[in-house]
């Protein structure tokens, strides 16, 4: 049936990659079964599955046995099987150092070198090259490669060249010994030209020593006049550039060579020269550029005859501008020449790629000049030219679907100038919004880019709006009066463009094909919500989002609601969550959305003093709303809703999605609201619970002056303990969030500081000598966290309203408690911006441990003889996953902490006394560094006494900055120490004989 349906049928299990069904040994047995098959296709199919097996189970024992097995089949199999073994070695490069018997592996496959089949020998040479990283100094292999270079078979020689390139990159001795051999082959008349072109790139790896690199450079320079053909010149220049960029010593000389070849009339040679310039302009080698080289390079711009060469030339200037040292030199000495050069490229109406690249060069120069003090006047003319041409380039590239990359370049560098000059940013926002809001049709990709650019501009101005007085870009007037008031916040120019953005959003939603522009709808919605962060949304904005409910799918609606929660617009979020929760089919999703809806409703009560149901029916009433809910009632209702959200979230969690961070965060938030409720209770109780008559004598006896104010003093101190408990809980949640994004970690830092600050304010009231105030370590690098931090700054300013009293004459009055209530009002009326990690996991890092010895069953302990040491071996695998191109943080090392605690002491006789000073708890720590995502460690646990011990292994992750994260797994087992019969106590002597009677033996 298989040949009729076209379905491939395998005789061994194909579902071995399912981790829940098989372990590594079972998978290896399945693959071994395929290798032993008589059909070559099944054998090859089994071989190609090994790289995935190594990724899933990167244990040295498994990898070693697998490669030994593959070596046997490499020797006995066909060339097709050898080819797939070669592919396995190439794809499993990260796991080659886990081959324990690498000598046996090489010895086994090296037998093929004596074969009469040149293809088999070629496959062997390529396999040896693939594993060269773990056998760099194998002299036998070096000799085999040298002999293979003299072969008369082209396939074998090409394989030997490949192996030479691999070994030259790993072995210094091989590179030195092969230098003369390769030189002779290149100059030999018997070696064909294509083979010589393959030999030249081998020389680029010979940079292990300065003498070798110098020798190879001279060899290449000697080859240039001997082989003036285009292909040879291109290959030699590329090789010389690679050598110079790695040694850095030869960069000035290589620049002179490249400048000479810029005058070559052959276009491919000039393009290679420009690419070499671009390589040498990188971060590693740009500091080695001499000053005359930059001037000589700019003078040779006229030699670039076509658009591709001009684009490459501008790319070199862009890289030079990114380095502060060379950028300053360009502005001081070559500003006029650069400006003339870039204007010439921008004026080309038929090549927008080159024009936008020239605009990028000018933008980098402007941004650098504006940020550097005293250099602003140098870039005024450049900024004028940027203002003159930016709008034209934006309009020309936005309407062409083939210019998406060019449009991205214009928008990116426009945002870069905005971060250095707010005035330019205001005009740039007007340009982009006017272009987006006109009636012209844009390709969907270009429209999305402009929406993303507006979001980036809005983020920058929101950061400026809520910037601290000590933050960057905030000019402090020395002549201003010193007052307690905060400086007025800066205005976000995006607010003035909000009607135009809303009009564009409504236009897209009303279109019949709005499903094709969902991404633009999401970005524009995010832009509106970010612009109005901290504000009460106008009715037109709410009506626009209500219109989305009937036009968009559930996933897009959820993303909009998620953005609303992240920017503190909880009414819109609750409205969308409630609607979507009634549509979804999955129970887990339903309860998750219900929990989010309850969270948003709780925050609505805290922020606005009105229930969500009332706001839904009377969002913009024509008459004054009913009296707001009192503060105590608000906190009580919000706490109840958070408890309901906790129950809903537990119902929505599953073993695959445990929602650990979400549950912990909701617990802390509910705990914090209950603490605020306690503070309001203390304020209300002060009126009805006056100090007792004996309060003065109690204060004198306890030597605590503030005890004379009675009940309120103890309640405030109890409140301080509750706030410090919240602070510690936030700190623990921070330490356990290794995979969280930067916004979430900043949010947790600010939340922790808010608890510490509020506790310090109350301490300054209820203690005679309060401790030092907490230090604010972050001001927020994102709009939502900086807005949160700005509320903490308002709390610090509010603290100044406390009466200034000496330590020995402090009082606790209504004025003090009114300040506490005002602090709570600031906390509750500041919209909560839920952290991103609450909704999205952009990075996942898991550690899977294997601990030995293991008990026979989960209920049985591990038996150990008394007086011996227990050897505990730990092996683990790191599994990474990231949706971003760059990880937020990586695992540098893993700390293993082993704790042994006596839980059941051994039985003792009535006359035996316990040992004095005996420690029943042992803690051992070890830091291991993962090798290719595999870690191993061992402990020698001393156990001297009998009984039962609880052995617990905890894992902590240490990132590249040395920060320890409590995010690893935890495993435990029970160890039973067996009593040694030979060491049991002898029976007590008989007391039947009379005292003093001599015993006879």
Swiss-Prot record:
<dbReference type="InterPro" id="IPR016024">
    <property type="entry name" value="ARM-type_fold"/>
</dbReference>
<feature type="region of interest" description="Disordered">
    <location>
        <begin position="980"/>
        <end position="1001"/>
    </location>
</feature>
<dbReference type="GO" id="GO:0034472">
    <property type="term" value="P:snRNA 3'-end processing"/>
</dbReference>
<comment type="similarity">
    <text>Belongs to the Integrator subunit 7 family.</text>
</comment>
<dbReference type="InterPro" id="IPR054519">
    <property type="entry name" value="INTS7_C"/>
</dbReference>
<dbReference type="InterPro" id="IPR056517">
    <property type="entry name" value="INTS7_HB"/>
</dbReference>
<dbReference type="GO" id="GO:0160240">
    <property type="term" value="P:RNA polymerase II transcription initiation surveillance"/>
</dbReference>
<dbReference type="GO" id="GO:0032039">
    <property type="term" value="C:integrator complex"/>
</dbReference>
<keyword id="KW-0963">Cytoplasm</keyword>
<comment type="subunit">
    <text>Belongs to the multiprotein complex Integrator, at least composed of IntS1, IntS2, IntS3, IntS4, omd/IntS5, IntS6, defl/IntS7, IntS8, IntS9, IntS10, IntS11, IntS12, asun/IntS13, IntS14 and IntS15. The core complex associates with protein phosphatase 2A subunits mts/PP2A and Pp2A-29B, to form the Integrator-PP2A (INTAC) complex.</text>
</comment>
<dbReference type="Pfam" id="PF24437">
    <property type="entry name" value="INTS7_HB"/>
</dbReference>
<dbReference type="InterPro" id="IPR056516">
    <property type="entry name" value="INTS7_N"/>
</dbReference>
<keyword id="KW-0539">Nucleus</keyword>
<dbReference type="GO" id="GO:0005737">
    <property type="term" value="C:cytoplasm"/>
</dbReference>
<feature type="compositionally biased region" description="Polar residues">
    <location>
        <begin position="989"/>
        <end position="1001"/>
    </location>
</feature>
<dbReference type="Pfam" id="PF22965">
    <property type="entry name" value="INTS7_C"/>
</dbReference>
<dbReference type="GO" id="GO:0160232">
    <property type="term" value="C:INTAC complex"/>
</dbReference>
<protein>
    <recommendedName>
        <fullName>Integrator complex subunit 7</fullName>
    </recommendedName>
</protein>
<dbReference type="Pfam" id="PF24436">
    <property type="entry name" value="INTS7_N"/>
</dbReference>
<dbReference type="GO" id="GO:0005634">
    <property type="term" value="C:nucleus"/>
</dbReference>
<dbReference type="GO" id="GO:0016180">
    <property type="term" value="P:snRNA processing"/>
</dbReference>
<dbReference type="InterPro" id="IPR033060">
    <property type="entry name" value="INTS7"/>
</dbReference>
<comment type="function">
    <text>Component of the integrator complex, a multiprotein complex that terminates RNA polymerase II (Pol II) transcription in the promoter-proximal region of genes. The integrator complex provides a quality checkpoint during transcription elongation by driving premature transcription termination of transcripts that are unfavorably configured for transcriptional elongation: the complex terminates transcription by (1) catalyzing dephosphorylation of the C-terminal domain (CTD) of Pol II subunit Polr2A/Rbp1 and Spt5, and (2) degrading the exiting nascent RNA transcript via endonuclease activity.</text>
</comment>
């Amino acid at each position: 049936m298989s040949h009729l349906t076209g379905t491939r049928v395998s005789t061994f299990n194909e579902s071995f990659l399912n981790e829940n069904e098989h372990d590594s040994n079972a998978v290896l047995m399945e693959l071994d079964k395929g290798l032993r098959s008589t059909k070559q296709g099944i054998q090859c199919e089994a071989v190609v599955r090994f790289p995935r097996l190594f990724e899933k189970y990167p244990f040295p024992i498994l990898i070693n046995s697998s490669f030994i097995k593959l070596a046997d089949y490499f020797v006995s199999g066909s060339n097709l099987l050898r080819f797939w073994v070669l592919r396995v070695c190439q794809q499993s490069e990260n796991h080659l150092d886990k081959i324990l018997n690498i000598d046996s592996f090489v010895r086994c496959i090296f037998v093929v070198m004596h074969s009469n089949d040149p293809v088999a020998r070629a496959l062997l040479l390529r396999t040896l090259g693939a594993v060269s990283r773990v056998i760099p100094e194998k002299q036998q292999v070096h000799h085999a490669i040298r002999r293979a270079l003299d072969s008369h078979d082209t396939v074998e020689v090409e394989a030997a060249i490949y192996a030479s390139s691999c070994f030259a990159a790993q072995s210094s001795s091989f590179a030195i010994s092969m230098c003369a051999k390769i030189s002779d082959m290149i100059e030999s008349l018997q070696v064909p030209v294509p083979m010589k072109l393959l030999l030249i790139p081998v020389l680029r790896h010979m940079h292990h020593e300065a003498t070798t690199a110098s020798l190879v450079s001279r060899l290449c320079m000697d080859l240039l006049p001997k082989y003036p053909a285009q292909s040879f010149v291109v290959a030699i220049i590329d090789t010389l550039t690679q050598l110079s960029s790695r040694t850095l010593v030869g960069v000035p000389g290589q620049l002179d060579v490249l400048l000479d070849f810029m005058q070559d009339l052959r276009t491919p040679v000039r393009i290679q020269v420009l690419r070499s310039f671009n390589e040498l302009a990188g971060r590693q080698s740009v500091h080695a550029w001499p000053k005359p080289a930059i001037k000589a390079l700019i003078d040779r711009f006229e030699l670039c005859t076509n658009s591709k060469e001009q684009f490459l030339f501008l790319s070199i200037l862009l890289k030079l501008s990114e380095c502060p040292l060379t950028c300053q030199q360009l502005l001081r000495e070559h500003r006029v020449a650069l400006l003339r050069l870039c204007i010439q490229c921008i004026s080309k109406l038929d090549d927008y790629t080159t024009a936008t690249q020239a605009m990028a060069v000018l933008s980098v120069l402007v941004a650098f000049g504006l940020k550097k003090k005293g250099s602003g006047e140098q870039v005024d003319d450049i900024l004028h030219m940027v203002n003159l041409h930016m709008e034209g380039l934006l309009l020309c590239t936005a309407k062409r679907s083939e210019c998406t990359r060019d449009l991205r370049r214009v928008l990116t560098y426009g945002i870069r100038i905005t971060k250095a000059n707010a005035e330019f940013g205001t005009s740039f926002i007007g340009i982009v919004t006017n272009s987006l809001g006109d009636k012209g049709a844009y390709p969907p990709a270009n429209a999305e880019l402009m929406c993303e650019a507006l979001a980036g501009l809005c983020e920058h101005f929101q950061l400026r709006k809520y910037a601290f007085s000590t933050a960057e870009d905030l000019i402090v007037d020395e002549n201003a009066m010193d007052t307690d008031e905060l400086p007025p916040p800066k205005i976000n120019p995006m607010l003035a463009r909000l009607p135009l953005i809303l009009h564009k959003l409504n236009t897209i939603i009303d279109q019949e094909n709005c499903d094709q522009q969902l991404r633009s709808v999401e970005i524009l919605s995010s832009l509106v919500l970010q612009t109005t962060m901290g504000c009460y949304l106008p009715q037109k904005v709410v009506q626009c989002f209500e219109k989305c409910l009937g036009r968009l799918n559930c996933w897009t609606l959820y993303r909009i609601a998620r953005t609303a929660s992240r920017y503190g617009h909880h009414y819109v979020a609750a409205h969308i969550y409630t609607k979507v929760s009634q549509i979804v089919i999955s129970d887990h999703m339903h309860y998750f959305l219900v929990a989010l809806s309850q969270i948003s409703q709780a925050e609505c009560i805290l922020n606005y003093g009105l229930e969500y149901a009332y706001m839904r029916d009377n969002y913009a009433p024509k008459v004054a709303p009913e009296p707001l809910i009192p503060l105590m009632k608000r906190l009580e209702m919000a706490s109840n809703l958070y408890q309901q959200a906790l129950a809903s979230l537990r119902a929505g969690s599953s073993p695959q999605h445990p929602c650990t961070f979400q549950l912990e965060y909701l617990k802390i938030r509910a705990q914090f609201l209950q603490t605020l409720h306690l503070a309001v209770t203390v304020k209300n109780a002060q009126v009805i619970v006056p100090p007792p008559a004996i309060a003065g004598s109690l204060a004198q006896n306890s030597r605590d002056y503030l005890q004379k104010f009675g009940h309120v003093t103890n309640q405030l101190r109890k409140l301080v303990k509750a706030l410090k408990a919240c602070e510690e809980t936030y700190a623990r949640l921070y330490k356990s969030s290794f995979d969280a994004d930067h916004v979430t970690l900043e949010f947790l830092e600010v939340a922790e500081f808010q608890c510490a600050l509020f506790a310090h304010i109350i301490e300054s009231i209820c203690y005679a000598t309060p401790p030092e105030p907490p230090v604010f370590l972050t001001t927020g690098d994102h709009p939502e966290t900086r807005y949160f931090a700005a509320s903490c700054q308002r709390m610090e300013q509010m603290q100044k309203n406390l009466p200034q009293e000496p330590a020995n004459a402090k009082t606790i009055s209504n004025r003090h408690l009114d300040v506490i209530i005002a602090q709570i009002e600031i906390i509750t009326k500041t919209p909560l911006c839920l952290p991103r990690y609450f909704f999205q996991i952009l990075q996942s890092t898991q550690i899977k441990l294997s601990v030995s010895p293991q008990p026979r069953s989960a209920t049985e302990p591990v038996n150990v003889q008394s007086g011996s040491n227990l050897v505990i071996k730990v092996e683990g695998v790191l599994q990474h996953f990231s949706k971003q191109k760059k990880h937020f943080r990586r695992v540098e090392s893993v700390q293993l902490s082993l704790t042994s605690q006596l839980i059941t002491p051994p039985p003792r006789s009535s006359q035996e006394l316990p040992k004095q000073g005996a420690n029943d708890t042992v803690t051992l720590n070890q830091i291991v560094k993962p090798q290719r995502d595999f870690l191993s460690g061992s402990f020698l646990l001393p156990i001297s006494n009998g009984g039962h011990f609880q052995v617990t292994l905890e894992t902590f992750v240490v990132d590249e900055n040395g920060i320890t994260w409590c995010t690893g797994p935890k495993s435990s087992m029970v160890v039973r120490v067996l009593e040694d019969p030979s060491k049991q106590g002898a029976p007590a002597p008989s007391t039947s004989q009379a005292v003093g009677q001599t015993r006879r033996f």
